[in-house]
Curated annotation (Swiss-Prot):
Organism this protein belongs to: Mus musculus
Spans through the membrane: 62-82, 127-147, 157-177, 182-202, 207-227, 229-249
Residue positions, PTM Phosphothreonine: T1036
Protein name according to UniProt: cGMP-inhibited 3',5'-cyclic phosphodiesterase 3A
Catalytic activity annotation: a nucleoside 3',5'-cyclic phosphate + H2O = a nucleoside 5'-phosphate + H(+); 3',5'-cyclic AMP + H2O = AMP + H(+); 3',5'-cyclic GMP + H2O = GMP + H(+); 3',5'-cyclic UMP + H2O = UMP + H(+)
GO cellular component: cytosol; membrane
Name of the gene encoding the protein in the UniProt record: Pde3a
Cofactor(s), by name: Mn(2+); Mg(2+)
Biased segments, Polar residues type: 472-483, 618-637
Length: 1141
């Protein structure tokens, strides 16, 4: 039975014999019948075993059949030749004699014996051979038509006939047979050769036997019947009739379907006709076909060239749906040839393999991003749904994207699950907050609020919230914002703002539209001190005039004060085309008529100013740094400010010029830095740049409130101190032009103004240039790396290092970040700090999302302000050649620089604060730690640095901290007033009638600043200095630092008691950090204020139920004074245990 099963399987295999499925079925049925016992079972068994070789080999069976048929035909021809040979010779001799006699009588054509007398019977001898040849032609015609319909190719049949002719001639020449014999022996040889060739050429046995047998029979008939021709020519006449018959059959095959309708289904034989006819045949298409079948069909096509596919192609029918595809292809759809389908099982298996790979937490982020993209594509195709893909705009180029898209995508979207080791290394309080349900209300406070939107599985489900109730979940009424919409994690901005990076070196006008929409908040009301603060509140005695600018500074402009302003198209406009917009006034941001220069802008009404945007004005355009309702913006007062700072006459009032109708209108006179470029009366204050508590408000008073030059002046001093002008050959005028235009773009709002940008820039510079105890440096000599070649100016490849001229190292146990971060990355960090809040409207991301601001719609509610800051600042840089201070960077360096700046700006979004902190902690707690040779590690350090600099207010001294606190409180109250006017719920801590300033700052320090400083210091990156126990911190310059040292004697005693057994062999050294000391001091101050407020209100017993605060005795997760044994590396520090938040 096993042998019989193998025989059945062999018969089912496709081969040259091409056994049909019906034949295999009959064979299987016969085998199943033989399995039953019978009286003659032994004989049947032996016969089956004898026929096994024939059944297994289709080639052998076909050859046996062809050979048997050829032998029978040869014997038949030999028998006919032997019996009729003598009589035929006699009849031929008699016929020849009669023909000679008739010829002698004058006859032209011989006639048969017994012919009719007269001339009419002279043509009768040729009727018989003509009729015979016509019969042969018809026979071969029907045979050819049958073969063509069955799928046999025409060249194959013609080649068989050619082989027959060649075999015929070969036999005649080799045997030397004369013309008087019937060629019985050559006939047998020719038949054998023809049958063998046919067996080898023909694809299927049934068709091969039919063709060979039919050809042999017709050849034999022609050999016997054509008596009027020579014996040697008779086979060739038969072959000629065969060729003509096949050609007629091919012609009939072409014209028959057009006349009689669609033919039955058949396989293709290599012509365009077959492909065209096949499209018209109704039938079921196979959905799954192997690649070999597809390749066989494509290789057989000779009329149309197909591309060679290395991967399976998805047919358009599957992508668009059969009905839609039939509609789109129209009348020419039948000419598309054979459609190629995809094996869904293979795609499903590939999708499963990729899913298994994504489960591995050790994969790099860029690899995970690529695998996830492929998985999404496969899962989309596996659903078999109609997909409508929009066409890509051919005018958009994707060749200029930065080169770090993969790593950038991985850095932006932390979708990998946190490993067990990382979860063990993180404190429970941080794990409780690392969740998508936490967000922040502003980049200044970062207070956590509950997100009402559903959790996105693909973005934040990898980190589960802790089981402990969150502070916001304890008392939801305290937040007072049930309907506040918050944001989700954002993608990288750079993919939505594709700009050719090569244009940065072209000193010409760049005619390209910007992709920026406009934020139009209401004008800020006058600053007012917080109401309801107790008498002991640290901000109760502060004046509200500390933050610029007061409403009195705003000057009403006349009709002649309008200036034409650069505007860009905010978003792709789907509305019908309208006439070109009129010139935009920079004072009010609205178009005005050019016909009457004396007419001023339209008057603003109160209700119109409360609208966040205007959707009815489709022709309205904006600048990069100006909005609709920015009457208090700094660029409005540009003329007056320049007149006061530069002591130049005020610009004459003139009507706005006339411009041609173009897509873009550029300023004829851009905002340029006034003379002198560097103010010389600021040296006394600029000498204090190397102190953490830099008197930035005193600097603002010396420069002048209205000038707005504080950012450009400080930027120039810091770049000059670092040697970046020489390292990168930065032109000073272009540098000052851009930074002056950048600071003009900052609005005069209480907190997010140009003073805040300058403070963040100074903090970043301080954190990267000041000595850090125990930090190893990549290079040994810090001075040698900053030397630049006089020819090249800078080592291209951005791996050179620069150091501050104020960097004085007392010994080799100090280091600084600038010694580990290349100069190009360091300069990108400084530029990002100057750009990071450009054109900030004074409103939070949640407010823009809740009011459906154009920027929120443009950036899909994700990092709205951060994306706008980066886009607007870069658009300003690329708008004028006068701003291009990076002209000496090559193409690769510029793209990398732009990538680093954008990444640093997007990192300031506190919606992703906990993700950054968790990732940084995992890197620090790793065995390897921070690898300064790895660009991704350096980028992460720079992102943490700018994040700490952005929220450094609580880490400053008390005086500066209170100034910044008043500014953010005023900005919050302005947003609360606008929310109340718009009928929106007032956001937490923004209700002017119920101030909670102390709670705001205490929660901000506890949840945001404290853990961030702790993580930054645990990596050994916080500036400080070694302090011996015997020094008693007497060398500190700040008297507050001495007071702070005296306030914590118990901590020192605890540390000394814990290390008492080791004092005999080691000398202990402490690390003093001024930043952390200020943070601890301010945190304790706000907790005391909360206690005093509770005592005044008589709610001490209910404080824990109303406000989620810590006990005053608890310490925040910040840095205390650390100690280290002399001679040990900093990695071996023994820190006091800190409580988890």
């Amino acid at each position: 039975m096993a042998v019989r099963g193998e025989a059945a399987q062999d018969l089912a295999k496709p081969g040259l014999g091409g056994a049909s499925p019906a034949r295999v079925a009959r064979g299987n049925h016969r085998h199943r019948g033989e399995s039953s016992p019978s009286p003659r079972g032994s004989g049947c068994c032996w016969r089956a075993l004898a026929l096994q070789p024939l059944r297994r080999s289709p080639q052998l069976s076909s050859a046996l059949c062809a050979g048997s048929l050829s032998v029978l035909l040869a014997l038949l021809v030999r028998l006919v030749g032997g019996e009729v040979g003598g009589e035929l010779e006699k009849s031929q001799e008699a016929a020849a004699e009669e023909e000679e006699e008739e010829g002698a009588r004058g006859g032209v054509f011989p006639g048969p014996r017994g012919g009719a007398p007269g001339g009419g019977a002279q043509l009768s001898p040729w009727l018989q051979p003509a009729a015979l040849l016509f019969s042969l032609l018809c026979a071969f015609f029907w045979m050819g038509l049958c073969l063509l319909r069955a799928g046999v190719r025409l060249p194959l049949a013609v080649a068989l006939l050619a082989a027959c002719c060649a075999g015929e001639a070969l036999v005649q020449l080799s045997l030397g047979v004369g013309d008087g014999r019937l060629l019985s022996l050559p006939a047998a040889g020719v038949l054998l050769s023809c049958l063998g060739g046919a067996t080898w050429l023909v694809l299927r046995l049934r068709l091969g036997v039919l063709m060979v047998a039919w050809t042999s029979v017709l050849r034999t008939v022609a050999l016997v019947s054509l008596e009027r021709f020579k014996v040697a020519w008779r086979p060739y006449l038969a072959y000629l009739a065969a060729v003509l018959g096949l050609l007629l059959a091919r012609y009939a095959e072409q014209i028959l379907p057009q006349c009689s309708g669609p033919a039955p289904p058949r396989e293709r034989f290599g012509s365009q006709l077959s492909a065209r006819t096949k499209e018209e045949i109704p039938g079921w298409k196979r959905r799954r076909r192997s690649s070999s079948v597809v390749a066989g069909e494509m290789s057989g096509c000779s009329g149309k060239s197909h591309r060679r596919t290395s991967l399976p192609c998805i047919p358009r029918e599957q992508l668009m749906g059969h009905s839609e595809w039939d509609h789109k292809r129209g009348p020419r759809g039948s000419q598309s040839g054979t459609s190629i389908t995809v094996d869904i099982a293979v795609m499903g298996e590939a999708h499963g393999l990729i899913t298994d790979l994504l489960a591995d937490p050790s994969l790099p982020p860029n690899v995970c991003t690529s695998l996830r993209a492929v998985s999404n594509l496969l899962s989309t195709q596996l659903t078999f749904q109609a997909i409508h893909k929009p066409r890509v705009n051919p005018t958009v180029t994707f060749s200029e994207n930065y080169t770090c898209s993969d790593s950038e995508e991985g850095l932006e979207k932390d979708k990998q699950a946190i490993s067990k080791r990382l979860r063990r290394s993180l404190p429970p309080g941080l794990l409780r907050r690392v969740s998508s349900t936490w967000t922040t209300t502003t980049s200044a406070t970062g207070l956590p609020t509950l997100e009402p939107a559903p959790v996105r599985r693909d973005r934040s489900a990898s980190i589960k919230p802790h089981e402990a109730p969150s502070p916001s979940a304890v008392n939801p009424d305290s937040w007072n914002a049930p309907g506040l919409t918050t944001l989700t994690k954002s993608r990288s901005f750079t993919s939505s703002y594709a700009v050719s990076a090569a244009n940065h070196v072209k000193a010409k006008k760049q005619n390209r539209p910007g992709g920026l929409a406009k934020i139009s908040p209401v004008p800020s009301p006058s600053s007012s001190p917080p109401q309801g603060s107790p008498a002991s509140s640290p901000v109760s005695n502060s004046a509200s005039q500390q933050f610029p600018e007061s409403p009195e500074v705003t000057i009403k402009r006349g009709p002649g004060s309008h200036r034409a302003l650069t505007y860009t198209q905010s978003a792709p406009d789907l509305s019908p085309q309208i006439p070109p917009p009129s010139v935009i006034c920079s004072s009010c941001g609205r178009p005005y008529s050019q016909g009457n220069p004396a007419d001023g802008p339209s008057e603003r009404s109160g209700p119109a100013m409360l609208k966040p945007n205007r959707t009815d004005d489709t022709s309205q355009v904006t600048s990069d740094y100006e909005t609709n309702n920015n009457s208090d913006s700094s660029d409005i007062l540009q003329n007056e400010e320049e007149a006061e700072c530069q002591r130049e006459p005020q610009r004459k009032a003139s009507a706005c010029g006339t411009y041609t109708s173009q897509t873009m209108i550029f300023l004829d006179k851009p905002i340029l830095a006034p003379e002198p470029l560097v103010m010389d009366n600021l040296d006394s204050i600029m000498d204090q740049l190397n102190t953490w508590n830099f008197p930035i408000f005193d600097l603002m008073e010396n420069i002048g409130r209205k000038c707005g030059r504080i950012l450009s002046q400080v930027s120039y001093r810091l770049f000059e101190d670092m040697g970046l002008f020489e390292a990168f050959k930065i032109p000073v005028r272009e540098f000052m032009n851009y930074f002056h235009a950048l600071e003009i773009g900052y609005r005069d709002i209480p907190y997010h103004n140009r003073i805040h940008a300058t403070d963040v820039l100074h903090a970043v510079w301080y954190l990267t240039t000041q000595p850090i105890p125990g930090l190893p440096s990549v290079i040994g000599d810090h001075g040698s790396a900053s030397d630049s070649d006089s020819d090249s100016g800078f080592t291209h490849g951005h791996m050179g290092y620069v150091f501050s001229k104020m960097y004085h190292v007392p010994d080799d146990k100090y280091g600084c970040l600038s010694g580990n971060i290349p100069a190009l990355e360091l300069m990108a960090l400084y530029v990002a700090a100057a750009m990071h809040d450009y054109d900030h409207p004074g409103r939070t991301n949640a407010f823009l999302v809740a009011t459906s601001a154009p920027q929120a719609v443009l950036y899909n509610d994700r990092s709205v302000l951060e994306n706008h800051h980066a886009a607007a600042a870069w658009n300003l840089f690329m708008s004028r050649p006068e701003y291009n201070f990076l002209v000496n960077l090559d193409h690769v360096e510029f793209k990398h620089f732009r990538f680093l700046v954008i990444e640093a700006i997007l990192a300031t979004d506190l919606k992703k604060h906990f993700d950054f902190v968790a990732k940084f902690n995992a890197k620090v707690n790793d065995d390897v730690g921070i690898d300064w040779t790895n660009e991704n590690d350096r980028l992460l350090v720079c992102q943490m640095c700018i994040k700490l600099a952005d929220i450094n207010g609580p880490a400053k001294c008390k005086e500066l901290h209170l100034r910044w606190t008043e500014g953010i409180a005023s900005e919050f109250y302005e947003q609360g007033d606008e929310e109340a006017s718009l009928g929106l719920p007032i956001s937490p801590f923004m209700d002017r009638s119920a101030p909670q300033l102390a709670n705001l700052q205490e929660s901000f320090i506890s949840h945001i600043v404290g853990p961030l400083c702790h993580s930054y210091d645990s990596a050994g990156l916080m500036p400080g200095k070694w302090v011996d126990d015997s020094d008693d911190s007497g060398d500190t310059d700040d008297p507050e630092e001495e007071e702070e040292e005296a306030e914590t004697p118990h901590e020192d005693e605890a540390c000394e008691s814990s290390i008492a057994p080791r004092k005999k062999s080691f000398k202990r050294r402490r690390i003093y950090c001024q930043i952390t000391q200020h943070l601890l001091q301010n945190h304790m101050m706000w907790k005391k204020v909360i206690e005093e407020e509770q005592c005044l209100s008589g709610t001490e017993n209910q404080s824990l139920d109303q406000v989620p605060l810590q006990h005053p005795s608890e310490q925040i997760q910040a840095i205390k004074e650390e100690e280290e044994e002399k001679g040990k590396p900093r990695a071996e520090e023994t820190l006091a245990p800190q409580p988890d938040l």
